[in-house]
Amino acid sequence: MPRGDSEQVRYCARFSYLWLKFSLIIYSTVFWLIGALVLSVGIYAEVERQKYKTLESAFLAPAIILILLGVVMFMVSFIGVLASLRDNLYLLQAFMYILGICLIMELIGGVVALTFRNQTIDFLNDNIRRGIENYYDDLDFKNIMDFVQKKFKCCGGEDYRDWSKNQYHDCSAPGPLACGVPYTCCIRNTTEVVNTMCGYKTIDKERFSVQDVIYVRGCTNAVIIWFMDNYTIMAGILLGILLPQFLGVLLTLLYITRVEDIIMEHSVTDGLLGPGAKPSVEAAGTGCCLCYPN
């Protein structure tokens, strides 16, 4: 091969190595910082949550979910940062495999949830009922439930009768809340003054007799129907979750290939020079990074 063509190929190889290296460093660092932020928010929320009597179910504790998500993002991204800086093949492979496993597990989880849709809905409804039992004791769940009921115009998990699981809303309970639902279940115009007593004495009545007063459909089905009607938003959310992980796997795989090519090139060069000979190719730098040779 003419010397000019050889130098051009070498320059392209060097450029691709550096481009992949810095792209992977930026990718890992961004998600490392995001993981640290999510973890910090989760820890702060959990500290605040512990000041009050709260839910025992980790599924319904947003702070616990944030902490777990933050820990996973922080640790995995840290491996990616360290691997890309050191050009360590073992760490790079570990980073790629972890991302790939997470991606596959998410896809499998989605397929299982769709395949066993009825069981998934029952699982969600059961957890919502457990949350309703502690509605007035857990501010996190209360705020989430109130928001969902107002936003999606629904009441309870399966339907409005789920509120009988709460000790204050049970029909046998003393007090004005008995046999009623929270005011966020009520049908009202935005211009009207909020009537916090609008949902009283509705649980023990039939759907048709209260459907003009409160929302009778459950929030689980309401949210599912909303996502089906707004499939573009759902597709955007799925892409936002899955695409970065896929790009991370692809980027790491390409970078591993380039690092292996460099190692192979150096091995061949050293073998041709013979034992004890000084190679003419010198490293461009040392330290935290394995730099591409000049």
UniProtKB/Swiss-Prot annotation:
Transmembrane segments: 24-44, 63-83, 94-114, 236-256
Cytoplasmic topology ranges: 1-23, 84-93, 257-294
Glycosites: N118, N189, N230
Posttranslational mods: Palmitoylated.
Extracellular side stretches: 45-62, 115-235
GO MF: enzyme binding
Span of the signal peptide: none
Membrane topology note: Multi-pass membrane protein
Disulfide bonds: C154-C219, C155-C185, C171-C179, C186-C198
Highest taxon above the source species: Eukaryota
GO biological process, one term: protein maturation
General function of this protein: Part of TspanC8 subgroup, composed of 6 members that interact with the transmembrane metalloprotease ADAM10. This interaction is required for ADAM10 exit from the endoplasmic reticulum and for enzymatic maturation and trafficking to the cell surface as well as substrate specificity. Different TspanC8/ADAM10 complexes have distinct substrates. Promotes ADAM10-mediated cleavage of CDH2. Negatively regulates ligand-induced Notch activity probably by regulating ADAM10 activity.
Oligomeric and partner information: Interacts with ADAM10; the interaction influences ADAM10 substrate specificity, endocytosis and turnover.
Assigned protein family: Belongs to the tetraspanin (TM4SF) family.
Protein name (Swiss-Prot/TrEMBL): Tetraspanin-15
Organism: Homo sapiens (Human)
